[in-house]
From Swiss-Prot:
<dbReference type="GO" id="GO:0005576">
    <property type="term" value="C:extracellular region"/>
</dbReference>
<keyword id="KW-0961">Cell wall biogenesis/degradation</keyword>
<keyword id="KW-0325">Glycoprotein</keyword>
<dbReference type="GO" id="GO:0045490">
    <property type="term" value="P:pectin catabolic process"/>
</dbReference>
<keyword id="KW-0134">Cell wall</keyword>
<comment type="function">
    <text>Acts in the modification of cell walls via demethylesterification of cell wall pectin.</text>
</comment>
<feature type="binding site">
    <location>
        <position position="349"/>
    </location>
    <ligand>
        <name>substrate</name>
    </ligand>
</feature>
<protein>
    <recommendedName>
        <fullName>Probable pectinesterase/pectinesterase inhibitor</fullName>
        <ecNumber>3.1.1.11</ecNumber>
    </recommendedName>
</protein>
<feature type="active site" description="Nucleophile; for pectinesterase activity">
    <location>
        <position position="423"/>
    </location>
</feature>
<comment type="similarity">
    <text>In the N-terminal section; belongs to the PMEI family.</text>
</comment>
<feature type="signal peptide">
    <location>
        <begin position="1"/>
        <end position="22"/>
    </location>
</feature>
<dbReference type="GO" id="GO:0042545">
    <property type="term" value="P:cell wall modification"/>
</dbReference>
<feature type="binding site">
    <location>
        <position position="494"/>
    </location>
    <ligand>
        <name>substrate</name>
    </ligand>
</feature>
<feature type="region of interest" description="Pectinesterase inhibitor">
    <location>
        <begin position="40"/>
        <end position="191"/>
    </location>
</feature>
<dbReference type="InterPro" id="IPR011050">
    <property type="entry name" value="Pectin_lyase_fold/virulence"/>
</dbReference>
<keyword id="KW-0378">Hydrolase</keyword>
<feature type="binding site">
    <location>
        <position position="379"/>
    </location>
    <ligand>
        <name>substrate</name>
    </ligand>
</feature>
Length: 584
């Protein structure tokens, strides 16, 4: 017999969700020595929402003053409380800087200024979350995944602040000062994760929440492809964006030119801004072109950077969204700088980046990004992305330690080259790198190479982790002769729940037989998630792998790391000349 639609309210559905995750207890109302232990409706609602929170006590305390049992109102109240806590953390940071007065050194001032900036980013995202939620979660519907993504960013911005502080006393002071807002942000993620997970387990999609429908049988694979059109392209990318990425080959290049597949393509795109060192464009520097881009742009700011070496540090502010840069080739258009923690006073890891993308919707093609500080510069980032939905094709990233900082949001890289030594692909984002060349370099004497260092501090409630899919991991020409004596590893855990998957990748013999390494002085490897599947090459032999890494036996075990799942809701581009592989 066919199952009919069951129409319910959001409040009822959340109650059912509470039952599904085992948090609503029906108490016997009968009398007895124990008296009436029945919880009132408000307490039940709070208990239900807070059951999955990392800090249940803090969660309940936050919601106790809210005199309502409406889950929508409770969740919105929780978001407002989180916003208030982040505001206090921002004010605390400013007062800490003021309290240090003239005694503050350049590095402390730089890191506190950065803290203030990223905490403001967190506030802006919380404001967006509250606005998008509306008065009722029914208005959120299919935005639930996006709301959770923004919440992940709010949490990450606060960890960014602490991560950049190297001075121990200041790190302790700031850690304690923003602890409350970080806890509330963490709890908020847990609440959203519990709701979306429980609904998924009950075959309730987020769109059903919007429609008020429970119990419909979903279409096949809807959870993977619900945000793709009939051609397999992401709905969030406009027709103009798709054409831009298809057309943005190196101007005049043959169609087969490139680092790998999907090379040139004619360069028919019409830029809004042109940068040229010889004065033949509107601007001589990239930074000038970025400043000319509008804020909160519903369209695209398209910057064509002509061939040349541009020695400058470029920052794309958070409000300058939807920037698309393309050049004349990854070895022809090069953006380079040499700022580093080791050699540049007043510099932190986050501030060392040659190019720093703070905004959403960034796209790049046919550009080389370099940090030339060298191994003695220690942390020296070539490219850092903080914004959500970054799409990078046919680019090259060269550095030593911390080359590619995939710091926040959802990021997709295809057909790139990235080189480095220590933790040279690292961050706290959901990142997939496909069909790319990864090169370990020769660093300082005795230095060990680590390809990845993921910074997942939150666990499985968030999608934070690095996926290397169908790549090649090799030694560069300077390391080639010493590749068997210089130790190189696939990665090490930067944070307690570090997550990294290497799938369908050719691994050279430079990688140690153990595959993965521990973070010195920490036990993060005991809670980290490291997965390998269907790899090839001499370095892919898993016989001597560390016991805490998982060697997947079937595709089902790594399905969650596909583009369609890891970067949900499938927010990436599939183009004819540079295709996106949604599955394995």
């Amino acid at each position: 017999m066919a199952v009919g639609k069951i129409v319910i309210s959001v409040a009822s559905m959340l109650l059912v969700v509470g039952v599904a995750i085992g948090v609503v207890t029906f108490v016997n109302k009968g009398g007895g020595a124990g008296g009436d232990k029945t919880l009132n409706s408000h307490q039940k609602a709070v208990e239900s929402l807070c059951a999955s929170a990392t800090d249940k006590g803090s969660c309940a305390k936050t919601l106790d003053p809210v005199k309502s049992d409406d889950p929508s109102k409770l969740i919105k109240a929780f978001m407002l409380a989180t916003k208030d806590a982040v505001t206090k953390s921002t004010n605390f940071t400013a007062s800490t800087e003021e309290g240090m007065g003239k005694n503050i050194n350049a590095t402390s001032k730089a890191v506190l200024d950065y803290c203030k900036r990223v905490l403001m980013y967190a506030l802006e995202d919380l404001e967006t979350i509250v606005e998008e939620m509306g008065e009722d979660l029914q208005q959120s519907g299919s935005k639930m995944d996006q709301l959770k993504q923004w919440l992940t960013g709010v949490f990450n911005y606060q960890t960014d602040c602490i991560d950049d502080i190297e001075e121990s006393e200041l790190r302790k002071v700031m850690g304690e000062g923003i602890a409350h807002s970080k806890i509330l942000s963490s709890n908020a993620i847990d609440i959203f994760h519990a709701l979306t997970t429980a609904m998924s387990q009950m075959n309730v999609k987020v769109d059903d929440m919007k429609k008020g429908n429970l119990g419909e049988t979903p279409a096949p694979d809807r959870d993977l492809l619900e945000d793709l059109d009939q051609k397999g392209l992401p709905k969030w990318h406009s027709d103009k964006d798709r054409k831009l990425m298809a057309q943005a080959g190196r101007p005049g290049a043959p169609a087969d030119e490139g680092i790998g597949e999907g090379g040139g393509g004619g360069g028919k795109i019409k830029p809004t801004h042109v940068v040229a060192k010889d004065g033949s464009g509107q601007f001589k520097t990239i930074s000038e072109a970025v400043k000319a881009c509008p804020e909160k742009n519903p369209g695209r700011c398209i910057i064509y950077i002509k061939a040349g070496v541009y020695k400058e540090q470029v920052t794309i502010p958070k409000k300058v969204n939807n920037v698309f840069m393309f050049g004349d080739g990854a070895t022809q258009t090069i953006i380079t700088f040499d700022r580093s923690v080791g050699l540049s006073p007043g510099t932190t890891t986050s501030l060392s980046g040659t190019v720093q993308v703070e905004s959403e919707g960034f796209m790049a093609k046919w550009i080389g990004f370099q940090n030339t500080a060298g191994p003695l510069g220690h942390q020296a980032v070539a490219f850092r992305v903080n914004g959500d939905r970054a799409v990078i094709f046919n680019c090259r990233f060269d550095g030593y330690q911390d080359t590619l900082y995939v710091n926040n949001g959802r990021q997709f890289y295809r057909n790139i080259v990235v080189s480095g030594t220590v933790d040279f692909i690292f961050g706290k984002s959901a990142t997939v790198i496909q069909n790319s060349l990864i090169l370990c370099r020769k660093g300082s004497p005795g230095q060990t190479n680590h390809v990845t260092a993921d910074g997942n501090e939150k666990g499985k409630a968030v999608k934070i982790g690095i996926v290397l899919h169908n790549c090649r991991i090799m030694a560069d020409k300077e390391l080639e002769a010493d590749r068997l004596t210089v130790k190189s590893y696939l990665g090490r855990p930067w944070k307690p729940f570090a997550t990294t998957a290497v799938i369908g990748t050719e691994i050279g013999d430079l990688i140690q037989p153990t595959g993965w390494n521990e973070w010195q002085g920490e036990k993060f490897h005991l809670t980290a998630t490291y997965v390998e599947f269907n790899n090839r090459g001499p370095g892919a032999n898993t016989a001597a792998r560390v016991p805490w890494a998982k060697m997947a036996k079937s595709a089902a075990e790594v399905e969650r790391f596909t583009v369609a799942n890891w970067l949900t809701p499938a927010n990436w581009i599939q183009e004819a000349n540079v295709p996106v592989q949604l599955g394995l």
